[in-house]
Regions:
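Membrane-interface segments of envelope glycosyltransferases acting on lipid-linked substrates or membrane lipids
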Residues: 1-156
Length: 156
């Protein structure tokens, strides 16, 4: 159950970094359209972060959380994400990606005590085909809600 008093705490993750791409555009569009007054929004910066995007997110009143590279320091990234979720008592994790490697964020959410874990698919293919196939059965069990940018992305 989400917190009744105070602001809801939401962490948003782009698995490809905060760069000029479709995922970041969707995240920014959502943040710009939402009433953020009843939420504390944390946006994870990993892999790469364009400074102008970081500034846009901060100008909306959101917090940027710097974490190790998801690509090169995956375990360290996952541990720090889990700790942050637990310490901040995050209500919702909304992770954007292209494959079942979103398992990393969904597992961090579960282990961190986050009740609402949203996996958001942005594509119908991925670069990590082997990891995707291996992680997919676990992935299906970890998220509580799933979004997609289109019908094909949702079916994939």
């Amino acid at each position: 159950m989400l917190r009744k008093m105070g602001k809801k705490k939401v962490i948003i993750v782009s698995t490809v970094g905060l760069i000029y791409d479709g995922i970041t555009s969707v995240i920014l569009s959502y943040l710009q359209a939402m009433n953020l007054s009843k939420m504390d929004i944390y946006v994870v910066s990993t892999i790469k972060c364009e400074q102008s995007i970081k500034k846009s997110i901060q100008d909306l009143g959101c917090h940027i959380i710097e974490l190790p590279s998801r690509k090169t320091e995956t375990l360290k990234y996952a541990v720090q994400l889990t700790k942050f979720i637990r310490l901040q008592k995050i209500d919702v994790i909304h992770a954007h990606g292209n494959s079942a490697t979103l398992t990393v964020e969904m597992l961090a959410g579960l282990l961190g005590g986050c009740k609402k874990r949203i996996a958001h698919s942005h594509n119908t293919q991925c670069e990590q085909v082997r990891a995707d196939k291996m992680l997919r059965p676990l992935f299906y069990r970890l998220y509580t809600d799933a979004f997609a940018c289109g019908k094909a992305a949702g079916e994939w």
